[in-house]
Amino acid sequence: TPIAYFSLSNDNLSYEKFQQKTSFNRLNRAIDNAKRMKQYPAVKIGRLAIDESHRNTGVGRYLLSLIKSSMIINQKSGCRFITVDAYNDAIGFYEKNGFVMVNAFNPEKRTQPMFFDLAQLL
């Protein structure tokens, strides 16, 4: 029986996704001027699920670490960021693992867009 799974797809982190354009500009300043763009390649975590009997055991943290390492070592996707539309009750988990909210929390939405900058690991 599987204890966890995840799915990935190509995505982007773009200027349009940020309600506060100053947040995108702050992110942009961390990137070399010659390489700045209006959108950046990303890999989206479409699903990340852990069997209830294995929650709070480090399996989720391990899978995120595996995903992050894979993006840096393999470089098959050519991405700079990992994105996720986190369920509201999972935001804390992603924040503990270095993800940042794209916009301010919106209680009317079931999910919140978040991202992780892979440059932190280099």
Regions found by a protein language model. Name each.
Residues 1, 7, 29-34, 55, ...:
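An acidic/histidine-cluster motif and surrounding catalytic segment
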Residues 56-70:
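Conserved acetyl-CoA-binding loop-helix of GNAT-fold acetyltransferases
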Residues 5-47:
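Conserved acyl-donor/pantetheine-binding loop and adjacent beta-alpha core of acyl/acetyltransferases
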Residues 60, 64, 88-90, 104-114:
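Short glycine/proline-centered loop/turn elements that form peptide/ligand docking sites
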Residues 46-56:
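A short, internal acetyl-CoA/4′-phosphopantetheine-binding micro-motif in the GNAT/acyltransferase core
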Residues 3-4, 103:
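A structural microfeature
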Residues 83, 95-116:
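Conserved catalytic-core motifs of GNAT/GCN5-like acyltransferases
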Residues 64, 71-86:
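Conserved GNAT acetyl-CoA-binding A-motif
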